[in-house]
Swiss-Prot record:
Species of provenance: Saccharomyces cerevisiae (strain ATCC 204508 / S288c)
Any single GO CC term annotated in Swiss-Prot or TrEMBL for this entry: cytoplasm
Low complexity compositional bias, start-end: 436-463
Gene3D superfamilies: alpha/beta hydrolase
Biased composition (Basic and acidic residues): 670-681
Main location: cytoplasm
Name of this chain's protein: Putative lipase YDR444W
Lineage, highest ranks first: Eukaryota, Fungi, Dikarya, Ascomycota, Saccharomycotina
Enzyme Commission (EC) number: 3.1.-.-
């Protein structure tokens, strides 16, 4: 990595039992904290000092008492650890039979022992230097009080790393660089004299910035740091760590804290650099939380997002975020505890319950008049004056799990409306063209990626994208898009209501805009309890999956740009009183419909649906590098299409254009801007 906090004194221990101790560390970590080490050995230099080795031994021990092992709900009192040779890269096949060592939960009084090899996988270029990166991450998820202690040793024999009491002396050729959480999340820009693009990340419930969002941060920096100066976005990634352990305080409170943090961070950075652009990335509850932060800023500092004098909004990205709440998707036995405060104010917010006598700071502008029904925090978020800010983002993107996410199901993560009809017809075309070349992703006709590439058309002349050739896993994934012999209409009514209109269509008939009478199998709904338990029980990627990208079957199955004119007419508006009395969920559905339409009636959204293995809610952000690697496809897509070289080239071109006062452009103009210049890998390969 290009930055380091400390270059530790290199040392050598001569041990009476035989062997040489090269590293002996002892540290403590709280919730949301980690240490990253880069251990390097110059083989030629240490050979001159009598150390001729082809491998070394690493030992990490959780020094906490074994009595803490059963206390999982208040902990867990464990560490996640991985050891990556210098040449390991998720994008490339890792050669040979060497394993990538990691442990998902190093429990109290347990030891993690690894034999690290000085070979081509760890060799730095053509030099005699060999290097490894070691991440040691606290797994604490709830309480902020404990500090977990670990010991970390590297030596030339197993005995010396197990127990060593010898004499140290300095040695050349061995180095250990160390980064703590604060330093990793406070890296400076590559070009201090150039304008800075600030990326703000926001975590979800029982989560944290320092550890859980680290993989996405790493990937954004790995993508942008090597870019040529002419197009380099000069990224700085930051995240507010003050909400750790406070998930129940409510969306308003959490968002206000993030909003204040953003203002303070920008003001602080502007003393050294010039913050020119800003992007937001939120996971799970982080989506509504960052939305509240944007609202707070738009009210407290109306000029903050000014296109000329302020910071330009670029990306607004959410991954598995409950925009319209979860009350319609959670079973009754879980909804009641949320109403009663099982997750504090946050649970009530997500269950669309109003809590009086709470702060209204940053919710309303003094000169605004709001509808009487706008009392739910999730409904207030996209309203004026924040709406103008959300509309001004260059890109607004939603990532949602199609299946296996009972925490934030597809319906709320995708803002209610999807083009089910297009997905169904694409599947039919895929079956007819089994022998045609296929792409690695599904790309819809309206995807920002599809410009400049041809794609097949259906019988109505509407362009559709392609889905990859079928495999057993993909068949299970997409079985819900296939025509079925028998299915009851009542089971798919909510999908009919969520079906978007075709572009330039005047149809307002629900049945007509859905599947033209064809039978439809909706996606299987995940069980909320099982989804929560999957954090503990979900399968972990094997070594073949970790080392070989070709075997990974998790994929993007839908990627489309949704325009406001595609929204169907509101279903729950002006309904007869009798229906309001008959249907128990009428009120909830009406509120959720209002929220979804408020977000989409004036804004274009890119909706990306991914199919990844359980536990998909954590996998979608790769919460832990190897445990949650199934979500690699989502993170890769997000980074490539929002921070990739082509996108950065466009931003660089925009920055070089004359900066005149912006006129009042239409939403259609903003939508066209969103489409410009993005080409997906799937579209490039389409035939």
């Amino acid at each position: 990595m290009p930055y380091k906090i400390n270059r530790m004194k290199n040392s050598l221990e001569i041990n009476e039992t035989g062997g040489t101790l090269l590293v002996d560390e002892r540290k403590r970590l709280r919730i949301g904290e980690l240490y990253r080490y880069k251990f390097s050995v110059n083989k030629d230099v240490i050979k001159e000092q009598g150390l001729d080795v082809s491998h070394l031994f690493l030992r990490i021990k959780n020094e906490e008492s074994a009595l803490l092992r059963p206390l999982y709900l208040t902990g867990p009192y464990s560490f996640y650890i991985d050891v990556r040779p210098h040449n390991y890269n998720e994008n490339r096949k890792f050669p040979g039979k060497e394993i990538i060592p990691f442990v998902e939960n190093l429990k109290p009084d347990e030891r993690f022992k690894v034999k690290i090899l000085l070979n081509e996988n760890s060799r730095v270029g053509d030099t005699s230097l060999y290097s490894w990166t070691i991440d040691i991450i606290s797994q604490l998820a709830v309480t902020t009080i404990p500090k977990l202690e670990f010991s970390f040793r590297i030596g030339t024999t197993r005995k010396v790393v197990k127990k060593s009491n010898g004499l140290f002396k300095s040695i050349e050729g061995v180095s250990l660089e160390m980064w703590d959480t604060e330093t990793l999340w406070d890296l400076p820009p590559k070009f201090p004299e150039k304008p800075v693009h600030l990326v703000i990340m926001t975590h979800g419930i029982f989560s944290n910035i320092g550890c859980d969002m680290l993989y996405m941060k790493d990937k954004i920096e790995e993508m942008t740091f090597p870019m040529d100066e002419s197009i380099n976005p000069n990224i700085i990634v930051r995240g507010f760590m003050g909400n750790v352990g406070k998930s129940g305080h409510g969306i308003h409170c959490l968002g206000v804290r993030v909003g204040k943090y953003v203002l303070e961070t920008v003001d602080k950075l502007n003393k050294k650099y010039k913050v020119d652009r800003i992007s937001f990335i939120g996971h799970s509850l982080g989506g509504p939380t960052q939305s509240m932060a944007v609202r707070y800023i738009s009210i407290k500092r109306p000029d903050f997002f000014d296109a000329v004098k302020g910071v330009k909004p670029v990306n607004f990205i959410t991954l598995a975020s409950p925009f319209i709440g979860v009350i319609g998707d959670f079973p009754f036995y879980l909804s009641v505890p949320l109403d009663m405060g099982a997750l504090g104010l946050t649970g009530r917010d997500l269950n669309l319950k109003y809590t009086p006598l709470t702060s209204k700071d940053g919710l309303y502008a003094d000169d605004e008049v709001y509808p009487e029904h706008s009392k739910y925090i999730l409904e207030i978020l996209p309203q004026a004056p924040a709406k103008k800010v959300f509309e001004s983002f260059k890109r607004r993107t939603i990532y949602a799990n199609v299946m296996d996410d009972g925490i934030v199901p597809l319906r709320t993560a995708a803002l209610l409306y999807l083009d089910w009809r297009s997905i169904h017809k694409v599947q039919k075309i895929r079956k007819k063209n089994k022998n045609s070349p296929t792409s690695s992703e599904f790309v819809s006709s309206d995807s920002p990626e599809s410009s400049g590439a041809s794609s097949p058309s259906n019988e109505n002349g509407n362009n559709v994208g392609e889905i990859p050739a079928e495999s057993p896993n993909k068949k299970a994934t997409l079985q819900w898009t296939l025509p079925q012999a028998v299915i009851h209409g009542s089971k798919i009514n909510k999908y009919k209501r969520g079906q978007t209109n075709e572009a330039n269509s005047d149809s307002d008939n629900e049945q007509g805009v859905f599947l033209d009478g064809q039978k439809f199998e909706p996606p299987k709904e995940a069980n909320t309890v099982l989804s929560a338990l999957s954090v503990l029980t979900a399968a972990i990627p094997d070594q073949e999956y970790i080392k070989n990208p070709a075997v990974r079957k998790d994929e993007v199955i839908h990627d489309k740009l949704y325009h406001p004119e595609e929204l169907p007419p509101p279903h729950y508006e002006n309904r007869p009183i009798v229906k309001k009395l008959i249907y128990p969920n009428e009120s909830v559905n009406r509120i959720q419909e209002r929220i979804a339409r408020e977000w989409q009636e004036t804004m274009t959204w890119r909706k990306v649906l991914v199919q990844i293995q359980p536990d998909s809610h954590n996998n979608i952000v790769v919460r832990r590098r190897f445990v949650n690697l199934y979500g690699y496809v989502a993170v890769e897509h997000m980074v490539e299409h929002h921070f990739g070289s082509k996108v950065c080239s466009e931003l660089a071109e925009d920055a070089n254009e004359p900066k005149d006062e912006p006129n009042q452009s239409s939403q259609a103009d903003r939508s066209n801007e969103y489409n410009e210049g993005e080409i997906s890998k799937g579209a490039e390969n389409a035939t």
